[in-house]
A protein has these predicted regions:
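Active-site core of metal-dependent hydrolases
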Residues: 1-112, 136, 168-170
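His/Asp/Glu-enriched, well-ordered alpha-helical/loop segment
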Residues: 103-184
């Protein structure tokens, strides 16, 4: 566990940022923190609620703030992964070390299950979902998209999250969709 900003302090930070035309994103893990940040005017969440299932109150707060974006950054399923498909793409000793570290972790499985249910429900309720990963470059974005589908989003919705919604979140008007005048 780590120290967190108080609602008064993060509210002041959000207000000050907005006065200067800046948007604010915060890491969130708990339902109560999400509610407080939504009330304070947060623009986007990195990660998602993983301590308990979302309730009607937080859904109403999201409805009141339709421009808020959720970037789930799912924590990984917690199940040992078969990484053999990486053979030949990275040094064999690194692959062996990665496979040895990939073990079943019950706590991670529980957190993934909660966050996956919440992602599915928030997506179904119309919350804008964008894309991010804490796994670094390379194959991890693909694993993140697979986890988003495993969580209950449709493959099409995941592609929209990874392209259009992410470009919109980053205010990259020339990216995100295949349209005349945009970079492909």
């Amino acid at each position: 566990q780590f120290d967190k900003l108080t609602p008064e302090l993060y509210g002041a930070v959000i207000d000050e940022a907005h006065q200067h035309g800046l948007r604010v994103t915060a890491h969130v893990y708990t339902l109560e923190d999400a509610k407080g940040l939504l009330r304070a005017g947060l623009d986007a969440f990195a990660h998602g609620i993983r301590d308990t299932d979302v309730d009607d109150e937080v859904l109403e707060l999201f409805r009141e703030r339709p421009d808020v974006v959720l970037v789930p950054n799912l924590p990984g399923s917690g199940f040992a992964a078969d990484l053999s498909w990486l053979s030949g793409t990275i040094p064999a000793d690194e692959l062996t070390q990665m496979q040895e570290r990939s073990v079943d972790r019950p706590a991670a499985q529980e957190a993934f299950g909660i966050q996956a249910r919440n992602l599915a429900r928030l997506s179904a309720e119309g919350v804008t979902i964008a894309f991010g990963t804490d796994g670094g470059a390379g194959w991890s974005p693909h694993a993140e998209m697979e986890d988003m589908v495993r969580a209950g989003m449709s493959p099409g919705d995941v592609l929209v999250a990874a392209t259009r919604n992410s470009a919109d979140l980053l205010m990259l008007d020339d990216l995100g969709t295949l349209e005349a005048g945009k970079s492909a």
